[in-house]
Amino acid sequence: MKYDHQSIETRWQKKWEDSGIFQCDTEADKPKYYVLEMFPYPSGNIHMGHVRNYSIGDVVARFKRMQGFNVLHPMGWDAFGLPAENAAIKNGTHPAKWTFANIDNMRSQLKRLGYSYDWQREVATCTPEYYRWEQLFFLRFLEKGLVYRKKAAQNWCPKCHTVLANEQVIEGLCWRCDSAVEQKELTQWFLRITDYAEELLADLSKLENGWPERVLSMQRNWIGKSTGAEIRFALDGRDDSITVFTTRPDTIFGATFMSIAPEHPLVEELIDGKPQADDVRAFVERIRNMDRIDRQSDTLEKEGVFTGAYCVNPFTGRKMPIWVANFVLAEYGTGAVMAVPAHDQRDFEFARKYDLPMQVVIQPQGEALDPATMSAAWTEAGALVNSGAFDGLANEDAKQRIADDLETTGNGRRTINYRLRDWNISRQRYWGAPIPVIYCDACGVVPEKEENLPVVLPLDVKTHDDGRSPLPHTPAFYECTCPVCGGKARRETDTMDTFVESSWYFARYTDATNDKAPFTPDALRYWLPVDQYIGGVEHAILHLLYSRFFTKALRDCGFIELDEPFANLLTQGMVLMDGSKMSKSKGNVVDPTEMIARYGADTVRLFCLFAAPPERDFDWSESGIEGSYRFVGRVWRLVEELREHLLAVGACSSTAEDAKTPVARELRLKEHATVRKAGDDLNDRFQFNTAIAAVMELVNALYLAKDELVADESGRKVLSSAVSTVLTLLSPFTPHLSEELWALLGHTESVSTLPWPRWKEDALVRDTVTLVVQVNGKLRGKLDIPADASREEVETLALNEPNVLRYLEGVTVRKVVVIPGKLVNVVVS
């Protein structure tokens, strides 16, 4: 009988769906395991990256079920956002119609791969049933002071017609469309993620045993904690001051000028009435539209313009010119930097370019730095010089002494600064969750009443070809009544950043059909945190950081009782073609649907899991998938050939008594060694490729042993046990193949419900071992001896082995070297 993967796979997929075998409920008396892959944007078709990601998750889910866990393995759709809106506009259709058609198609594709999802828990973030709870969270955050509105310069994508969070700007370009990002003054809604900066940083230590260090490091760097001091510099000729943040208060005596950001609020005041005002304004306008990341680059050419204003160094009394510089950012620290060119490389380059003074205040041991001959700033440790009463102090000690002085005199204070900035969630696009806020001329900004949720995104709108939102031009949406005074009012027409939806979806899965609440405390307590989260490392900062923040904010609003959403994280590698990322523009895309039609879902899954460890990239290869296809066929033919013999003995687990011959004993040993190896590789290490390799070796052993073992009943029992083990071990990887062959062997229960096999210690002990016998290091014979033979018995048997005896004639045996379990070397002369 030919292996017809198409009919076999679709038949088993229907059986699984009809039986609800993968549905789960909260069972307080059973250990839980929550495995989750990052849900996809419904683009219309899955790609090979999806296949790899979801195949990894499915193996984990199936393996954990076999270990006795109550497994939650859900799937849904990250369905709002720019891609869907832009694609719908391009194709002349409505984003909702486009999105739901894509969801239907991708759901069918995922089902065709045989993933063991609980489809009852499916969510789509673009439905009112989902985003009503997100709007509730917004109102509770607003009530708690975690949401605020302000006007500020924002990252603006002219092509997408919306603002971008700092994390969504990659090297000055929009993360979605690669357009150059501009700066635009807008009033926006923000979430106070900075309120959680320290906790987000500190709690990374809780994840050290479960998350990749690379991701932890990326989050630490993005949060960017700096310990230092704020110092006030009086403005010359004015009753005002300008404050800087510095991590190097020990260098205060070397500050010779000040650099401020083009966006600094004092720029206009400082240049008012100055002859260079127009030059400064032109410089500010040019630099403000530069990418913030580029402005921090070490290779950036340092540029600036003198404001004509001065400040006064509080320690030296020296007047310091104030410059606007391109490398100073308004959002870092205070937007002003005390420039110490002798001890900061950026300041050094700037001072050299504009001929500004330098003052050495830290000398390395045994050297005397001279500003006139320095080729770079001295940024290492040393002793203070030219620093008044602090001369001679080690610079680390001086940091504390000078900070003490600042706090005593009132000129400054110790402080901590973070690179992290509050999360701008306002988007000027249509396809997103409406922000539940109303503007009333009489009452101001008014939150929508909770009982009026959801604020439904209207579907009866006409989208604009250029991407502008239709909501500000849809009176039926924005015209409303003020919840406070009952007067005429206007709804907010911005929608929420789609990363808001993905920041809490993992919690909704625990109670996805609840229409009275986003989730219940019992469901959350039982299922959370997610035991194993799986997704790409590209989400390290955006999605993963936002989800961690959202969990803590929901906790503080009384919704959740935990601190971290994901206990363990696996970041899978990419599927490449000829070393490059697959993309339509490169013409190197492999279509999963085509591969499934040609080879079957099991083969596609198997290849994606066998090609490389899950965290590493791998190259797609025709020879590789052909090899996986041959293996699937090999297993099919093995069981088909042995079927009648195996049906005769029935299902059994062979015993030591059944393994009467060396071949039987070796196969039984191989079976149990494979169970141990595969279990170790899957149990939290997730080394799928080596687990599969071990099963392949067992299949090879079966082929070598089958002809001898079918001859008697005890041998057939050993065969039956080993074949059953192969099908059980393969079931997480190739579930359709395993189900079909299991049924062909007369079993009525699903292989998916079987427990993971257990290996027996006694089966791993060999009764005999094979030793190589050498004479003067050259192979002359082999010995099969009892495993517990003594050294003396081994020597005697080796010296009397017939082939060896021929090489001992006429020579003198000087020494016999025995390496237990491996070889005997007879030294002669």
From Swiss-Prot:
GO CC annotation terms, alphabetical: cytosol
Binding site for ATP: 584
Motif position, 'KMSKS' region: 581-585
Localization per Swiss-Prot or TrEMBL: Cytoplasm
Segments carrying motif 'HIGH' region: 40-50
Catalyzed chemical reaction(s): tRNA(Leu) + L-leucine + ATP = L-leucyl-tRNA(Leu) + AMP + diphosphate
Main location: cytoplasm
Molecular-function GO terms, alphabetical: aminoacyl-tRNA deacylase activity; ATP binding; leucine-tRNA ligase activity
Swiss-Prot/TrEMBL GO biological process terms: leucyl-tRNA aminoacylation
Record has Transmembrane helix as a keyword: no
Gene3D superfamilies registered for this protein in UniProt: 3.10.20.590, HUPs, Isoleucyl-tRNA Synthetase, Domain 1
PROSITE patterns, per database record: AA_TRNA_LIGASE_I
Enzyme class: ligase
Keywords: Aminoacyl-tRNA synthetase, ATP-binding, Cytoplasm, Ligase, Nucleotide-binding, Protein biosynthesis
Keyword ATP-binding (UniProt): yes
Enzyme Commission code: 6.1.1.4
HAMAP family: Leu_tRNA_synth_B
Family, per entry: Belongs to the class-I aminoacyl-tRNA synthetase family.
Name used for this protein in its record: Leucine--tRNA ligase
Organism this protein belongs to: Nitratidesulfovibrio vulgaris (strain ATCC 29579 / DSM 644 / CCUG 34227 / NCIMB 8303 / VKM B-1760 / Hildenborough)
